UniProtKB/Swiss-Prot annotation:
Pfam families listed in its UniProt record: DUF150_C (PF17384), RimP_N (PF02576)
Similarity remark: Belongs to the RimP family.
HAMAP family: RimP
Gene Ontology CC, one term: cytosol
Protein name (record): Ribosome maturation factor RimP
Transcription regulation listed as a keyword: no
Organism field: Rhodopseudomonas palustris (strain BisA53)
Role this protein plays: Required for maturation of 30S ribosomal subunits.
Length: 272
């Protein structure tokens, strides 16, 4: 493997400066990271993505059918389009060739994190609070290494989780220390798919507006916040009305009675 060059010498030049409001999100460190060869790739890819306005999510090096390096990336708001993946691949390929973090031939794949994405930053655990997740621990918590349940956000340096399928007297609520987590990811649900589609449409619309393909929205239009979580909320119980409902007056029974009354068969019922 070649010596790692200075990152400042191999970063691609960006066309536009990164807006100040995005710098904080771009600079947020990952709390769940990969070891070994993937860590060497991350040391090269991370600064490149940051300079382009993207965040590194996860790197996976697979040896099946040859060596494949998969790089997951995203915009600061969590969205990712095909055009973003193409731009990253084009900029990152020559940088990896120079840095050479892998000592054999490999195939580079750049992708979005996916709908059932890994959670690697503090903001990820906060953004997807209310959704179903599964978490694997590097260090067991109360004798367990695998957990599944509804994410409750961050409490200090730990993740709050409301576990599913708890039996007996076990407390469903647990706090899992973030630095002890080896893998955390969302579980595919209908609510998660709907939320992902919403964010994707917003990102695509903004890209078309920036390219001049789509006219800008009117000044009075309400702007959606793609960083806001739209997790499903508990349904409130409907209060029962105490007002007595008026019984119907035009049922089949009433019509038959009216016909018999017209023929003089019976007297009209009281109140009709």
């Amino acid at each position: 493997m070649k010596p790692m060059p200075d990152q400042t010498d191999i970063l691609p030049a960006t066309a536009d400066p990164i807006p100040a409001e995005l710098l904080e999100l771009l600079s947020e460190p990952r709390l769940v990271v990969e070891p070994g060869v993937a860590a060497r790739v991350a040391a090269v890819a991370g600064p490149v993505l940051h300079g382009m306005g993207y965040r590194l999510v996860r790197i996976k090096v697979s040896g099946e059918l040859g060596c494949t390096v998969q790089i997951m990336a995203e915009r600061p708001d969590g969205t990712m389009l095909i055009e973003d993946c193409e731009a990253i691949s084009k900029a990152l390929s020559p940088v990896l060739d120079v840095a050479d973090p892998i000592d054999k031939a490999y195939r580079l794949e750049v992708s979005s994190p996916g709908i059932d994405r890994p959670l690697v930053r503090r903001s990820d655990f906060e953004r997807y609070a209310g959704y179903l997740v599964k978490i694997d621990m590097a260090v067991p918590h109360q004798g367990r290494k695998r957990f599944r349940g509804i994410l409750g956000g961050i409490e200090g340096d730990a993740v709050h989780l409301q576990r599913e399928g708890v039996r007996g007297d076990d407390d469903p609520a647990v706090l899992l220390t973030i630095e002890d987590i080896s893998d955390a990811r969302l579980v595919l649900t209908d609510e998660l798919i709907a939320e992902s589609m919403r964010r994707g449409k917003i990102a695509e619309r903004e890209m078309k507006q920036n390219l001049g393909i789509l006219p800008p929205p009117p000044p009075h239009a309400k702007k959606s916040d793609p960083t806001k979580s739209n997790a499903p909320k508990p349904k409130a119980a409907k209060a029962k009305s105490k007002v007595a409902k008026t019984p119907p007056k035009n049922t089949k029974e009433h019509r038959l009675a009216a016909e018999r009354l017209r023929r003089g068969d019976i007297d009209p019922p009281e109140g009709d």
